[in-house]
Amino acid sequence: MIEVKRDDFFVESIKNPIEYGTYYKINSKYGTGFQWTSEVHHDFIITATDIRFNQETMVGEHIGSGYVLALYISGAGDEFYPYQNISPNTLRCYEPSEKYKAIYHPQIPLRCITVQVDQEFIDQYLQEISGDLEVNFSDFFKEKGKFYLPNVNHAMQSLYEYLLSMKASRITVEAKIYEIISYLASYLKENRLNEENGQPINKTDLQALAELTH
């Protein structure tokens, strides 16, 4: 097993085919692939990863200053804090400055997309679209298990594919971020109302949970 050293993980930037962001090629001693990252808007940062490791690889770091929503599109391995395996097509949440550690298995493509957003930006956007929408994103991002929300998963994967199409416009990417936040807000509002009214979990969530357990 090899542990990633941040000072040599990326060896060079790749010529960027779109107008913003940076593509980084990874060091061949770790594997093949790249990572694209961009502060598309000053309130959120997007990272798209497509890497195939040569051997068992450990990655340890701390999450940045914002809340992070991640979608594993493909990949295999184990995350710590808490311990759980990495499953394709599942979402994960990370809080600001949270400790992150994972071991990725070799020769299985690690494809994922993360969106880091600022709490103030989320609050401001929610106020604009619905002044009375009471949702608590900070509690949502305390969720430490992997989960599946159909609309959010689809929007995140669509954004990943759009970014890798090399035709992604900044305006469209921003619109997709707002779409993802709106889906999350709707989900949180629906579940808050269900709790207040004593309603059971909805059929969509039951199906999602069933898919995770099989």
Predicted regions and their residues:
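Alpha-helical structural motif
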Residues: I2, F10, I45, S65, ...
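Short Lys/Arg-enriched alpha/beta "domain-start" segment
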Residues: M1-T22, I26
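A short mid-domain helix/strand-loop element embedded in enzyme catalytic domains
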Residues: I122-D123, S130-D139, G145-S158
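N-terminal regulatory/effector-sensing and dimerization cores
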Residues: Y23-V135
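Generic structural signal of hydrophobic/aromatic residues within well-ordered alpha-helices
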Residues: K5-I14, I122-L126, F137, L159-L163
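A short, Lys/Arg-enriched amphipathic alpha-helix from helix-turn-helix/homeodomain DNA-binding modules
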Residues: Y148-L164, E174-L188, L193-H214
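Hydrophobic transmembrane alpha-helix bundles
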Residues: M1, P96-H105, Q119-I122, K176-Y178, ...
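Solvent-exposed loop/turn segments connecting transmembrane beta-strands
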Residues: A168-R170
